[in-house]
A protein has these predicted regions:
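C-terminal structural segments of small proteins and small subunits
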Residues: 63-91
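Short S/T/G/P-rich N-terminal loop/turn motif that feeds into the first structured element of a domain
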Residues: 1-54, 61-71, 94-97
Length: 97
C-alpha cells in the first residue's frame, strides 16, 4: 500500500500566535493518526519561482490515512485556530508503492 503525504509550503505568516496555536493542535491530530513529521521548518532553498517561509512534510501509512486525518474533528479544530493566520499551499498526495 502506498503511503500518503501532506506537503505544505507556507508562503506568508500573517499571525504568529495563530500559527503557534495551530501547530500544537495539528501535531496532536497528526500523531494520533499515525502521522510522522519528516520536515518541519528548518533550512530550505526555494527554487523555480518558489516563495516559502516554512515547509512541512508529513508521512502517513496510507493515502487514506492522510485524507482521514485532514477530515478528522481534531485537525478541523486546528484549522479553526489557524483562521487566516497564514497563506499556504497544502496538498495531500499518494506516494509511490
Amino acid at each position: 500500500m502506498a503511503k500518503g503525504y501532506w506537503m505544505t509550503a507556507y508562503r506568508e505568516i500573517l499571525d504568529a500566535e495563530k500559527l503557534s496555536a495551530y501547530v500544537a493542535l495539528a501535531a496532536d491530530a497528526v500523531q494520533a493518526n499515525g502521522g510522522r513529521f519528516l520536515v518541519r521548518g528548518g533550512q530550505m532553498q526555494p527554487k523555480e519561482h518558489a516563495v516559502a517561509e516554512r515547509t512541512v512534510l508529513v508521512e502517513f501509512d496510507s493515502y487514506e490515512a492522510a485524507l482521514a486525518t485532514y477530515a478528522s474533528p481534531a485537525y478541523q479544530k486546528a484549522l479553526e485556530a489557524l483562521d487566516g493566520g497564514v497563506v499556504r499551499d497544502l496538498r495531500i498526495v499518494e506516494g509511490i508503492d
